[in-house]
Protein backbone atom coordinates (compact mmCIF):
# COMPACT_ATOMS: atom_id res chain seq x y z
CA UNK A 1 0.00 0.00 0.00
CA UNK A 2 1.45 3.32 -1.06
CA UNK A 3 2.02 5.73 1.80
CA UNK A 4 -0.22 8.74 1.40
CA UNK A 5 1.65 11.51 3.16
CA UNK A 6 -1.01 14.13 2.56
CA UNK A 7 -3.72 11.90 4.01
CA UNK A 8 -1.59 11.18 7.09
CA UNK A 9 -1.05 14.89 7.66
CA UNK A 10 -4.80 15.48 7.58
CA UNK A 11 -5.40 12.62 10.02
CA UNK A 12 -2.82 14.02 12.44
CA UNK A 13 -4.30 17.49 12.06
CA UNK A 14 -7.78 16.12 12.75
CA UNK A 15 -6.60 14.31 15.88
CA UNK A 16 -4.94 17.47 17.19
CA UNK A 17 -8.09 19.50 16.57
CA UNK A 18 -10.21 16.85 18.31
CA UNK A 19 -7.91 16.88 21.35
CA UNK A 20 -8.08 20.67 21.54
CA UNK A 21 -11.88 20.57 21.33
CA UNK A 22 -12.06 17.99 24.13
CA UNK A 23 -9.75 20.03 26.37
CA UNK A 24 -11.65 23.27 25.80
CA UNK A 25 -15.03 21.57 26.23
CA UNK A 26 -14.03 20.01 29.56
CA UNK A 27 -12.70 23.35 30.75
CA UNK A 28 -15.83 25.26 29.79
CA UNK A 29 -18.26 22.71 31.28
CA UNK A 30 -16.58 23.12 34.66
CA UNK A 31 -16.44 26.89 34.36
CA UNK A 32 -20.12 27.14 33.42
CA UNK A 33 -21.17 24.89 36.32
CA UNK A 34 -19.29 27.11 38.77
CA UNK A 35 -20.53 30.37 37.27
CA UNK A 36 -21.88 32.68 39.96
CA UNK A 37 -20.63 30.44 42.75
CA UNK A 38 -17.18 31.92 43.33
CA UNK A 39 -16.43 35.21 45.04
CA UNK A 40 -13.51 37.63 45.02
CA UNK A 41 -14.79 39.98 47.73
CA UNK A 42 -15.29 38.70 51.27
CA UNK A 43 -18.29 40.99 51.80
CA UNK A 44 -20.17 39.18 49.01
CA UNK A 45 -19.70 35.67 50.42
CA UNK A 46 -22.81 34.12 52.05
CA UNK A 47 -22.36 32.63 55.51
CA UNK A 48 -21.64 28.91 55.64
CA UNK A 49 -20.78 27.06 58.83
CA UNK A 50 -17.73 25.37 57.34
CA UNK A 51 -14.85 26.54 55.21
CA UNK A 52 -12.99 23.74 53.42
CA UNK A 53 -9.37 24.76 52.93
CA UNK A 54 -7.87 22.80 50.05
CA UNK A 55 -4.24 21.99 50.73
CA UNK A 56 -1.07 22.79 48.91
CA UNK A 57 2.58 22.74 49.90
CA UNK A 58 3.87 25.57 52.10
CA UNK A 59 7.11 25.68 50.11
CA UNK A 60 7.93 25.40 46.42
CA UNK A 61 10.27 22.70 45.06
CA UNK A 62 12.98 25.38 45.21
CA UNK A 63 12.23 25.78 48.94
CA UNK A 64 10.85 29.27 48.44
CA UNK A 65 7.58 30.46 50.01
CA UNK A 66 4.56 29.15 48.11
CA UNK A 67 2.26 32.11 47.55
CA UNK A 68 -0.64 29.83 46.65
CA UNK A 69 -0.42 28.46 50.19
CA UNK A 70 0.09 31.90 51.76
CA UNK A 71 -2.84 33.42 49.88
CA UNK A 72 -5.20 30.56 50.79
CA UNK A 73 -4.38 31.04 54.46
CA UNK A 74 -4.98 34.77 54.13
CA UNK A 75 -8.30 34.16 52.37
CA UNK A 76 -9.69 31.82 55.00
CA UNK A 77 -8.59 34.17 57.77
CA UNK A 78 -10.54 36.93 56.02
CA UNK A 79 -13.64 34.74 55.93
CA UNK A 80 -13.40 33.77 59.58
CA UNK A 81 -12.78 37.30 60.84
CA UNK A 82 -15.71 38.57 58.75
CA UNK A 83 -18.03 35.98 60.31
CA UNK A 84 -18.55 34.18 57.01
CA UNK A 85 -17.50 30.77 58.40
CA UNK A 86 -17.51 29.30 61.92
CA UNK A 87 -15.01 26.48 61.55
CA UNK A 88 -12.34 25.24 59.18
CA UNK A 89 -11.63 21.83 57.70
CA UNK A 90 -7.99 21.95 56.59
CA UNK A 91 -7.59 19.17 54.05
CA UNK A 92 -4.23 17.99 52.77
CA UNK A 93 -1.55 15.36 53.15
CA UNK A 94 1.50 14.45 55.19
CA UNK A 95 4.51 14.23 52.90
CA UNK A 96 7.16 14.55 55.60
CA UNK A 97 8.48 11.03 55.00
CA UNK A 98 9.37 11.63 51.35
CA UNK A 99 12.99 10.90 50.40
CA UNK A 100 15.11 14.01 50.55
CA UNK A 101 12.78 15.75 52.98
CA UNK A 102 9.13 16.64 52.76
CA UNK A 103 6.45 18.53 54.61
CA UNK A 104 3.26 18.04 56.56
CA UNK A 105 0.64 20.24 54.91
CA UNK A 106 -1.75 19.99 57.83
CA UNK A 107 0.75 21.12 60.47
CA UNK A 108 1.78 24.01 58.24
CA UNK A 109 -1.84 25.00 57.63
CA UNK A 110 -2.83 24.75 61.29
CA UNK A 111 0.16 26.78 62.47
CA UNK A 112 -0.43 29.44 59.82
CA UNK A 113 -4.15 29.64 60.60
CA UNK A 114 -3.41 30.10 64.30
CA UNK A 115 -0.85 32.79 63.44
CA UNK A 116 -3.64 34.55 61.52
CA UNK A 117 -5.91 34.59 64.56
CA UNK A 118 -8.05 31.50 63.98
CA UNK A 119 -8.50 29.48 67.20
CA UNK A 120 -7.15 25.94 67.24
CA UNK A 121 -10.52 24.81 68.62
CA UNK A 122 -12.31 25.52 65.31
CA UNK A 123 -9.71 23.85 63.07
CA UNK A 124 -10.29 20.27 61.89
CA UNK A 125 -7.36 18.46 60.27
CA UNK A 126 -8.15 16.06 57.42
CA UNK A 127 -5.10 14.03 56.43
CA UNK A 128 -6.90 12.30 53.56
CA UNK A 129 -6.95 15.39 51.37
CA UNK A 130 -4.30 14.21 48.93
CA UNK A 131 -6.83 14.66 46.13
CA UNK A 132 -9.57 17.24 45.72
CA UNK A 133 -12.12 14.43 45.31
CA UNK A 134 -11.13 12.97 48.69
CA UNK A 135 -11.47 16.35 50.39
CA UNK A 136 -14.91 17.02 48.93
CA UNK A 137 -16.49 13.63 49.57
CA UNK A 138 -15.02 13.23 53.05
CA UNK A 139 -16.43 16.61 54.08
CA UNK A 140 -19.89 15.19 53.44
CA UNK A 141 -19.60 11.51 54.32
CA UNK A 142 -17.39 11.77 57.41
CA UNK A 143 -17.85 15.30 58.72
CA UNK A 144 -21.51 15.57 57.70
CA UNK A 145 -21.09 18.84 55.81
CA UNK A 146 -23.09 19.27 52.61
CA UNK A 147 -23.13 23.07 52.50
CA UNK A 148 -19.59 24.45 52.40
CA UNK A 149 -17.35 27.30 51.32
CA UNK A 150 -14.25 26.20 49.44
CA UNK A 151 -11.03 28.15 49.76
CA UNK A 152 -8.46 27.95 46.98
CA UNK A 153 -7.53 29.84 43.83
CA UNK A 154 -10.40 30.47 41.40
CA UNK A 155 -9.52 27.79 38.84
CA UNK A 156 -9.25 25.18 41.61
CA UNK A 157 -12.46 26.35 43.28
CA UNK A 158 -14.34 25.96 40.00
CA UNK A 159 -13.21 22.36 39.60
CA UNK A 160 -13.96 21.59 43.25
CA UNK A 161 -17.44 23.10 42.90
CA UNK A 162 -18.11 20.85 39.92
CA UNK A 163 -16.95 17.81 41.89
CA UNK A 164 -19.10 18.86 44.83
CA UNK A 165 -22.17 19.22 42.62
CA UNK A 166 -21.72 15.62 41.44
CA UNK A 167 -21.74 14.49 45.08
CA UNK A 168 -24.87 16.40 46.10
CA UNK A 169 -22.92 19.06 47.99
CA UNK A 170 -23.91 22.72 47.90
CA UNK A 171 -20.53 24.42 47.50
CA UNK A 172 -19.41 27.96 46.83
CA UNK A 173 -15.84 29.22 46.60
CA UNK A 174 -13.91 32.16 47.98
CA UNK A 175 -11.06 32.88 45.61
CA UNK A 176 -7.63 33.26 47.12
CA UNK A 177 -5.30 35.42 45.09
CA UNK A 178 -2.94 33.60 42.73
CA UNK A 179 0.80 33.93 42.96
CA UNK A 180 2.20 37.26 41.84
CA UNK A 181 4.97 35.33 40.07
CA UNK A 182 3.81 35.18 36.46
CA UNK A 183 5.64 31.97 35.54
CA UNK A 184 3.98 30.18 38.47
CA UNK A 185 0.56 31.41 37.39
CA UNK A 186 1.04 30.29 33.80
CA UNK A 187 2.25 26.86 34.92
CA UNK A 188 -0.57 26.24 37.40
CA UNK A 189 -3.39 27.62 35.30
CA UNK A 190 -2.09 25.76 32.26
CA UNK A 191 -2.10 22.48 34.19
CA UNK A 192 -5.73 23.13 35.10
CA UNK A 193 -6.80 22.41 31.51
CA UNK A 194 -5.47 18.86 31.85
CA UNK A 195 -6.81 18.53 35.41
CA UNK A 196 -10.33 19.15 34.11
CA UNK A 197 -9.93 16.55 31.39
CA UNK A 198 -8.76 14.09 34.06
CA UNK A 199 -11.82 14.96 36.13
CA UNK A 200 -14.11 13.68 33.36
CA UNK A 201 -11.92 10.67 32.64
CA UNK A 202 -12.11 9.73 36.33
CA UNK A 203 -15.89 10.11 36.26
CA UNK A 204 -16.20 7.90 33.19
CA UNK A 205 -13.96 5.26 34.77
CA UNK A 206 -15.89 5.43 38.04
CA UNK A 207 -12.94 6.62 40.12
CA UNK A 208 -13.76 6.47 43.83
CA UNK A 209 -12.41 8.66 46.64
CA UNK A 210 -10.15 7.01 49.20
CA UNK A 211 -10.19 8.10 52.83
CA UNK A 212 -10.66 6.84 56.36
CA UNK A 213 -14.34 6.62 57.27
CA UNK A 214 -13.89 8.19 60.68
CA UNK A 215 -13.05 11.53 62.20
CA UNK A 216 -9.66 12.24 63.73
Can you say where each PLM-predicted feature lies in the sequence?
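Enrichment for repetitive, rod-forming helical segments
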Residues: 13-17, 79, 203-205
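N-terminal type II signal-anchor transmembrane helix
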Residues: 2-43
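Short linear elements at protein peripheries
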Residues: 207-216
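A transmembrane-helix-recognition feature enriched in membrane-embedded lipid enzymes
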Residues: 186-208
Amino acid sequence: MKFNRKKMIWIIFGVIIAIIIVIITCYMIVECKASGKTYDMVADVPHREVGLLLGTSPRTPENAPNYYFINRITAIAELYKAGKIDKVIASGGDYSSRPGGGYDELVAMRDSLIDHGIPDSVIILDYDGTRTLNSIVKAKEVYGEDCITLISQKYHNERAIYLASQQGIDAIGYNAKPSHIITKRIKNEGREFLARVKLFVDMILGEKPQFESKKK
